[in-house]
């Protein structure tokens, strides 16, 4: 026991803080909250822009009749797409907006308005 204590005293290194007053370098939480919330708030796309881009992607999909594409159109009922076609549309939307839609969310996107709502509320959409 005595040898252990002597060894620890011998190996102990003094550390001096480089900051004179640590409280001076800490930002108040309200400043951090404001800074980060402004970044997130400013990064969402405008819903009308998202709608136009989604409509354009769906109209350019080869299995869709462009005259049937409306903001409320359902992929299966109105546009006649099967589940595999719907997956391809979602993949095209991922490419258009530059982010990956998780599988569990992609399964829920069955219409143009659902796609617009999801993309407009996603902070990574470009």
From Swiss-Prot:
- What's the PTM story here? 4'-phosphopantetheine is transferred from CoA to a specific serine of the apo-ACP-like protein.
GO biological process terms, semicolon-separated: mitochondrial electron transport, NADH to ubiquinone; proton transmembrane transport
Q: In which pathway does it act?
A: Lipid metabolism; fatty acid biosynthesis
Give all residue intervals belonging to the Carrier domain. Answer: 48-123
- Tell me which residues bear O-(pantetheine 4'-phosphoryl)serine: 83
Query: What keywords were assigned to this record?
Result: Electron transport, Fatty acid biosynthesis, Fatty acid metabolism, Lipid biosynthesis, Lipid metabolism, Mitochondrion, Phosphopantetheine, Phosphoprotein, Respiratory chain, Transit peptide, Transport
The annotated transit peptide is positioned at: 1-36
User: What are the GO MF terms of this UniProt record?
Assistant: acyl carrier activity; cobalt ion binding; metal ion binding
Name a single GO cellular component.
Answer: mitochondrion
Q: Where in the cell is it found?
A: Mitochondrion
User: What is said about its interaction partners and assembly?
Assistant: Complex I is composed of at least 49 different subunits.
Q: Which NCBIfam families match?
A: acyl_carrier, PRK00982.1-2, PRK00982.1-4
Q: What does this protein do?
A: Carrier of the growing fatty acid chain in fatty acid biosynthesis. May be involved in the synthesis of short and medium chain fatty acids. Accessory and non-catalytic subunit of the mitochondrial membrane respiratory chain NADH dehydrogenase (Complex I), which functions in the transfer of electrons from NADH to the respiratory chain.
For this protein, the record's PANTHER family field holds:
ACYL CARRIER PROTEIN (PTHR20863), ACYL CARRIER PROTEIN 2, MITOCHONDRIAL (PTHR20863:SF71)
The UniProt entry's sequence similarity note says:
Belongs to the acyl carrier protein (ACP) family.
What is the official name of this protein in its record?
Acyl carrier protein 2, mitochondrial
Q: Which gene encodes it?
A: MTACP2
